[in-house]
Amino acid sequence: MSEATGAGTARELLWTPSERRTRGSRMADFQSWVNRDRAVPLIGYDELWGWSVEDLDGFWGAVWSYFDVLASARPSAVLAERAMPGAVWFPGARLNLAENVLRHARDDRPAVVGISEHREREVLTGRDLVRQVASLAGELRAMGVRPGDRVAAYLPNIPQAVVALLATAAVGAIWSCCAPDFGTDGVLDRFRQIEPTVLLGVDGYRFGGRDVERLDTLAELSAALPSVRHTVVVEHLRAGGTPPAGALSFDALVAGDPPPRYEQVPFDHPLWILYSSGTTGVPKGIVHSHGGILLEHLKSHALHFDTGPDDRVFVFASTAWMVWNVLVTALAVGATIVTYDGNPVRPEPDQLFAICAAERV
């Protein structure tokens, strides 16, 4: 099959889905649902796309209903104020991203699979993940963390980072993360802006066969951030070393088994802070909300990526990249996610493909 380019010449398409696959996709199911439930007669993708950008209230209201978003209070409108900046989406709604992400966790099915260069393959079942998130969220509350407080992390792409993000969201606190390949100055350029109350950090990691210890850096960060009241160490490398004075053990904080509790927050309540690249000065914080991320990522994972409960999702990503956050929210459609902390081309150049094959991604 070929398509015409702007210059009028034809080029060969690398791949196009079969009609059977298209008809069986979640995008097709959503379109059929819209036709039936909303009485909007849409034929083909172009009409669906046109409706999505022309009728914002109708489309995003349909996304909310189609995915049956969990909310303790329903919104009074979809788009109450269209001014930009300042648009107001789903006023009156109260929900929590972590609750919606974890609702599809199955007790005995893998939710998170962790691969790294130096540790055995680690699996968190749905039961494990929900329990650890609830335990850490309870410990954060016991530390005095409240909705709107910032929790900063200095962690690699490992299952513990997934737990920490979701626990922070469960409390209604605001997550922000830098990868441990960042130096002290790069991290402080970001975290000083947000004044975190809790700092979670890794003891070290292995990349390309080389151990990189990070306890000294974590101590420097903790000392340079006067807002930090508690420092938590994730023992990943386990190479020894002295943790910062008074540091708490992540393993101990996730050992409890309390009932899950999810703080109900407004749709636009801050969820996490990402950062610009820093090429034009100090990196700028970019805030995303519980509701906005939930709807956008449900749409992306289910409709665009055609992902569901029988799928496994793997993204090679640093925790400092927004695509890592997207990996985590694949849990919201019931998928299993695979994390990898290590070199993408060692021990062999096809390392990432080997992981995909072994984990049936």
Language-model features: locations:
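A short N-terminal helical cap/helix-turn-helix that marks the beginning
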Residues: V53, G61-P75, P91-V113
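Conserved AMP-binding/adenylate-forming core of the ANL superfamily
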Residues: D46-W51, A98, V112-L166, G183-L188, ...
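Conserved pre-ATP/AMP-binding loop-to-beta segment of ANL
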Residues: D108-P110, V232-V233, P244-Y275, V282, ...
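Conserved AMP-binding/adenylation subdomain of ANL enzymes
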Residues: L294-R312, W321-V361
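AMP-dependent adenylate-forming
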Residues: S32-P41, A77, A98-T125, E235-T242
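A short helix-loop-beta submotif of the ANL/AMP-binding
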Residues: A137, R150, P156-T184, I194-L199, ...
